[in-house]
Amino acid sequence: YDVALGAEVLDLDSRMGLPSEDVMKAAMARAMDEGADPELVEKMGYGKTAIVATMKFSDDGPVVAFRADMDSNDVIESKASNHTPAKNGFRSRHEKAMHACGHDTHMTMGLGLAEYIATHKDGLKGTIKLIFQPAEEGVRGAKAMVEAGVVDDVDLMFGMHIGFNEQLSNCFACSDHGFLATTKLDAVFHGYSSHAGGSPEKAQNAMLAGCTAVINLQAIARHSGGASRMNVGVFESGIGRNVTPDVATLKLETRGATTEINDYMIERTKTIIKGAAEMHDCTFEITKQGETPAGRISDDLAREVQSIIEPLGIFKEVPFDYSGGGSEDCAYFLNRVIDRGGRATYMVLGSAIKAPHHNPLFDIDEEDMLNGIVALGTIATHYLK
C-alpha cells in the first residue's frame, strides 16, 4: 500500500473543534512516552491524525473507497467484573478515552480489509482506497479530508458502522437513510459579577441568560418538513453561592432530517441566544465545534450490495435499509462522491451490544467483526474484478 497521512490528506483550515494547543502537546508527549514512532507523531500531531492507504492494481477499473473512523468518546469505561474488556484486561488505558461507539472495531475491520485485499489481489483491476478518519465524534473530521480531495477520484464509496441494537444482531443492512444533518455549537454568555446580597442590582447575570436560553431553545417550534432535534448537553456557570455569575457556557447541538431543516434550527438558536443575552444585559459568543450535512445514498448501489452479501449466508438477515436517526460526518464523503458522478452507500453491521452506544458498559460481539471483514472484502473484490 501507498500510505499518505497527516497534512497530506487534510485541509487544515477545514478542521473543526480542535483541542487547545496544550492538550494536543500533552497527547503527543504521552504517545512518545508510550513508544510511538517520533516521525509519525511529528507528522500526525496537532490535530493531523488522518491516514489514507491506496493500492493500485491497474489504470482501468474503478476507484473504490472504504472509510473507517478511529476516535474514542469522552466516556469513563466501566471497571465492572461483568464488562468483558475489564475482565480480560483490555479496558481503556486512559480515562475519558473509551471506544464506546465501536470505532476501534471499525479500525480493526479496516485493517482486516487491507489484509484481505493484499492476499486476494491477483486479477483485481482499478484502485482501492482505505480511509482512516479522525474525529467523527462531534462530526469534526471528515470535512477536512474531503476538502483535501481524498475522494475526488472515487467511483464507489462505502462507509459502515457496527452495533446499534439487539434486533440487528448478526444482520447486515446495506444502506442507512436516517442520517440527520447536525451542528455542534458552544455558546458563552459574559456578564458582570457582584455581591449577591450587597449589590445585586449591579450584576449582569450570565447564568440567568443561560437559563433563559436553555428553556427557549428546547421550545423551538418543530419543522413541518421533517424531523428536528435540539439538545443542550452541558450548562456550566457560577463560582459561589453569594457571587452573581459573570460567565455561562452552553454546549449544544441541532439536528434536522435535511440540511435545510438543520439550518432552520441553527437560525432559531442564534436568535434565542442573542435575545437571552439582551434580556440580561450580557454579551455572547457562539463557536461552531462541528457540523455535517444530511447524507445521501445511491439506492441502486445498496441493492447491489444486498445481492452480493445475501449469498454469503453468514448473516441471518440482509435488509436493504436501516434508519438509525443519528448523524454521521461520513455524509461528507458520500455526498462528494455522488456530486461528482459516483455512487455511495453507508452500511450497518448489526451486533449484540451489551449496552447502548456511548455507555460505560458498551461492548460488541467480536465474532461480528470477522463477518464484517468478509463482507467488506467480498464487496471490494466484486467491484475490483
Language-model-detected regions and their locations in the chain:
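DPxDG-like acidic metal-binding loop motif
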Residues: 107-113
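Acidic/His- and Gly-rich active-site-bordering loop/insert found
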Residues: 1-98, 112, 119, 123-124
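Short Gly/Pro-enriched turn/cap motifs at secondary-structure boundaries
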Residues: 40-45, 136, 175-179, 321-325
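Histidine/acidic-residue-rich, glycine-tolerant segments that coordinate divalent metal ions
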Residues: 51, 73-74, 84-87, 91-98, ...
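Active-site nucleophile and cofactor-binding loops and adjacent substrate-binding regions
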Residues: 44, 97-104, 322-323
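Metal-dependent amide/peptide-bond hydrolase catalytic core
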Residues: 207-385
